[in-house]
């Protein structure tokens, strides 16, 4: 019995030692001091995830919702549904919301009309809620119909966890009983940090000109008129502002009691653009604040810009030990294969040699002749130093195909028959 107890003690000590010297993946990833309920930083070009923290948890997104409203506005303009010069006639709904001093707004006159351009600038720079409602009503007729468009577009983007109940990101309780029909009076828009990053990437990919407005530190609404109001950008990480960050040029803050202090930011340095999302950021005392969300974003971007673009495989490079693949019914038994285009990704500066690649076959094995030169046979799989596959938004893989580098013609029927007979005889011995 004493011997058994002694062995149990030894095993427990060994387990503790192993836990210390061999941290699990979660421990290994805890390298970014991000004080937030959820966070993610990705390469905007490829969608490669550089760091994620609780990034699949569905949380409140507050005014980050307006990025979807912006997307639908740009799409409507592109499709000719509306134009920048189209006038919006203020409704009772948008007018009453615009007069609520608790909310971010530019006041709208009840008998006034405003162009899409004016409303868009107020939404993008000042997060104006009534202006956003005006855009929604112009495009879809009602905010209810616009919300349906928001949810449909999210699914089209591959976002499965989005739940939009209004166009602004406000809690419905602030909409004075005029919230979209079919939504709860205390509901709020929700999504995961990963999905917010997908939305941000789609917006930047499809309508990069959005940054022309998002990067404006301040602008006068209706300058030179009695309605003139100074709009200061809520993104104070822009150049010349309180939390200035080199390369920052967008994109959208968000704050409600439910969502906390959140931010979807983007910055570009040395040709690399990153997207960082923080949700419900807090300070060291656990309190939410404007400073907290920007400090968390800074930590994410600093970490991300510590990565370097690295060519993991060159175009034409072959896989060691898999320079060729077997071919059935061909004039040759094997066909040479190689990477069709270079494989590039962002890797930490200190881990340039830590990544390796594998060939992931997409064609049947063995291949059956005829095999044409250039025929795709697989994809490149990239693994990190801990043997984990490099992760991308929406599960994308590195955009690198593996293809045949020669043609193997199909053998004639006699050769195929003789080969089958030879294989049969070989199998007897």
Predicted features along the sequence, with ranges:
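Structural motif marking the loop-to-transmembrane transition
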Residues: 1-4, 8, 61, 112, ...
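Sec-dependent N-terminal signal peptides of Gram-positive bacterial secreted proteins and lipoproteins
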Residues: 2-28
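Periplasmic/cell-envelope proteins involved in peptidoglycan metabolism and beta-lactam response
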Residues: 2-4, 149-154, 426
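Active-site-adjacent loops and short helices of periplasmic peptidoglycan-processing enzymes
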Residues: 23-194, 204-208
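Domain-terminus/edge residues, biased toward the C-terminal soluble/receptor-binding domains
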Residues: 177, 184-190, 194-429
